[in-house]
């Protein structure tokens, strides 16, 4: 029998910096089509893992190191999630990796994409952190410099407490004010069209690079508390 403690130790051995668990009863407020049981009907637990992004990548003018780091960390998370899925199956459970990309929902006019499940909302429900005004999940130890992955499973696991402490100060609007294209609203909603058109660009070789991370870098909680 797998326990939450054993599972977390396993994810740390694989290279995850954080691991949180949510029970399925926490997802009653999910939109239709984006509930974990809409993906796998026998889901009992949602496991969320996170790997941190090196803070030094925020302090350079060239977008290429940050882009490379984003891609490397994303690939690492996918590998950890796959290994976790196989580990659960080996122990007699069903499990499914939830990718951040590719995803099915896409509105071309607004350039709005939605993952099959929202990883940041899964992370919140699993106690990884809280969602900041910049719409990024913010962890107390690593701030918003984290990338997320998830696995849903029929294993019944002990859930972690949801983080109730507010990391964003009521009076702070640094991320909103610093966005070059005004993509961040006061209600934690980001205009994906404005953000993508400015921050996701193709260089002369046709390679996509991430040209802006202002909302991450100006946050006082960028590196955690």
Regions found by a protein language model. Give the residues of each.
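Non-catalytic, usually N-terminal nucleic-acid engagement modules in DNA/RNA processing proteins
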Residues: 1-77, 82
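Catalytic cores of enzyme domains
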Residues: 30, 36, 66-67, 72-225
